[in-house]
Curated annotation (Swiss-Prot):
Single GO cellular component term: plasma membrane
Known role: MFS efflux transporter; part of the gene cluster that mediates the biosynthesis of aspirochlorine (or antibiotic A30641), an unusual halogenated spiro compound with distinctive antifungal properties due to selective inhibition of protein biosynthesis, and which is also active against bacteria, viruses, and murine tumor cells.
Membrane topology designation: Multi-pass membrane protein
Glycoprotein found in the keyword field: yes
Protein name: MFS efflux transporter aclA
Bilayer-spanning residue ranges: 26-46, 64-84, 93-113, 125-145, 154-174, 181-201, 220-240, 251-271, 294-314, 327-347, 356-376, 385-405, 420-440, 492-512
Length: 551
């Protein structure tokens, strides 16, 4: 049965009024939104700068690590951060994570080698992943489930704004200054965000009697197994097909070990030896939350898929500069903002989420199918309209998946459920670069024979085609330019077709979900500090009875 599980009897969380939002709520909310904007800006700013960064640091096929180290780091620590925030509260982890993000940005800006860049991106990812996770956790602490999509929609719209401006900012800085300022620009922004968090983020939590007791509650064994397993899997995926053949032991050994570790992690989490699991098995014991987790993974993967490879399309097939390629993807990234807000408002008003999921994946399927027909002659009106539609689809999914997960779970599981959701979303971001990169590199190697110049062929082969993207490369090719452009065009065609298949899978999986009534009351241990209101009210401010169960 898909219904909310009962909360622990010994817990008496605060039942907060939701009729009005006071000054303290908005101070917390705005500071969180600004912090998430700063962290989100760097997610896509690297997309337009990546070919230049890879070329200047002589990264070659390691360009996927520059992108993936950020998303991998942000993914693997999210369950740990979620659990720590449950134990020590939300405030201190959020402040530390913002400091980590700033430190990573400084390392990236001063990078003199690919290894240093990857290290900096890893530190950045640790901070940004935790910031975006705690943004949603804290909003869930302050807002009941029925309203949650609306407020999460507004909060994530600031993320979408950062994502929208990222390619433009990254391209402009690369073209008119230096790629290093793509990272240095984060430092003053992070400083402002840090001050806002210190002054405004005052939320309560149950304090342990000592730090030793608090640290003893952390699932260190489970998190160690989890992080090692995910890192092994991603290492195999990144080097597979580019550095080593998929059948080689260098790929198979970490892949098998990672898969074994993933299974071992879940066995340990379900065992009596794990007293406080990072990712409790009960999160996955009903079909609605389990399906919604898969949808979250697919939606995130396809979002990254579109962002990275639309930029590549404009730089190579359309011959745009890095700055203009950032401008050209604004219809996609920018349209997610109003779409996310509208989707959240629809869910808050109607209390339904399945139609939004169907509409979102239907739009992704159609648009990615049409993307596969694009070439150098595709008119501007077509690619603008299609990007708006795919942005609409992503926006609808952005705010509607998490409430579907939480609807079947008690409020006490909010942090754990949100952490698992954030991990799968971040893991999806990693796959959203890796899968299309593998497809793209394989297709380039397949079509590269049409290029007659052996020197050019060698530069394009084995992952080199991505790092060479940009008009400066194509303008130097002379008679070979058309052959190289057609290689990019046909390779991207297959990338979009594979993406369409994943979007269709998401559309089909919505059938498995079940409608569950969204709660209109809020019970939490992590409300605003100093709150004394313990009256349970509905969204409209009228007292309600017990939490509604599934229909």
């Amino acid at each position: 049965m898909d219904q909310p599980s009962p909360s622990a009897e010994d817990s008496q969380p605060e039942r907060q009024s939701t009729g009005t939002r006071g000054t303290r709520f908005w101070a917390v909310f705005v500071s969180l939104c600004f912090a998430s904007f700063v962290a989100s800006l760097d997610i896509t700013a690297i997309t337009t700068a990546l070919p230049t960064v890879t070329r200047e640091l002589d990264g070659g096929e390691n360009y996927v690590w520059i992108a993936n180290s950020y998303t991998l780091a942000s993914a693997v620590v999210q369950p740990l951060i979620g659990q720590i925030s449950n134990i020590v509260g939300r405030r201190n982890p959020m402040i530390i994570l913002m400091c980590l993000f700033a430190l990573g940005s400084g390392i990236c800006g001063g990078a003199t080698s690919t290894g240093m860049m990857i290290a900096g991106r890893t530190v950045q990812g640790l901070g940004a992943g935790g910031i975006l996770l705690l943004l949603e956790v804290i909003v869930c602490d302050l807002v009941p489930l029925r309203e949650r999509a609306q407020y999460v929609g507004i909060a994530l719209s600031t993320c979408a704004l950062g994502i929208s401006l990222g390619p433009l900012v990254g391209g402009a800085l690369v073209q008119h200054a230096t790629w290093r300022w793509v990272f240095y620009i984060n430092l003053p922004c992070a400083g402002v965000a840090l001050v806002a968090l210190v002054l405004c983020l005052n939320v309560q939590h149950k304090r342990e009697v000592s730090w030793g007791r608090a640290l003893a509650r952390v699932d260190w064994v489970g998190n160690t197994i989890f992080i090692a397993a995910i890192c092994a899997i991603m290492y195999a995926l990144v080097i597979g097909g580019s550095v080593h053949p998929w059948s080689s032991y260098q790929v198979l050994v970490p892949l098998v070990l990672g898969a074994f570790g993933w299974v071992l992690f879940h066995i340990f989490e379900a065992s009596p030896y794990c007293l406080e699991p990072t990712m409790p098995p009960r999160l996955f014991r009903n079909r609605t939350s389990m399906t919604a987790y898969v949808l979250a993974f697919l939606a995130a993967m396809l979002m990254q898929w579109v962002v990275y490879f639309l930029t590549l399309f404009f730089q190579t097939v359309k011959g745009q500069s890095t700055t203009m390629s950032g401008v050209d993807v604004i219809p996609f990234t920018g349209f997610m903002i109003p779409s996310a807000i509208v989707g959240g408002a629809i869910m808050s008003k109607t209390g339904v989420y399945r139609p939004l999921h169907w509409a979102g994946f239907a739009l992704l399927s159609i648009c990615m199918g049409v993307f596969s027909t694009w070439d150098a002659g595709t008119p501007r009106a077509e690619w603008v309209i299609l990007q708006c539609l795919v942005g609409l689809g992503h926006g609808l999914l952005l705010t509607s998946v998490l409430p579907a997960i939480q609807a079947a779970l008690p409020e006490s599981d909010n942090a754990a459920a949100t952490s698992a959701y954030a991990f799968l979303r971040s893991f999806g971001f990693v796959w959203g670069v890796e899968i299309p990169a593998v497809v793209f590199n394989g297709q380039v190697d397949r079509f590269i024979s049409r290029v007659h110049d052996a020197t050019v062929r060698n530069k394009l082969a084995h992952g080199g085609a991505y790092s060479l993207a940009g008009t400066s490369f194509l303008s130097q090719l002379g008679d070979e330019a058309d052959a190289v452009r057609s290689t990019y065009t046909d390779s991207l065609r297959t990338v979009w077709q594979v993406g369409m298949a994943f979007a269709l899978l998401g559309f089909a999986l919505v059938v498995v979900e079940k409608h569950i009534e969204l709660r209109t009351t809020l019970e939490t241990d992590f409300g605003l500090e100093g709150s004394e209101n313990r009256a349970a009210t509905s969204v409209e401010g009228v007292e309600t009875g017990p939490v509604s169960k599934a229909q």
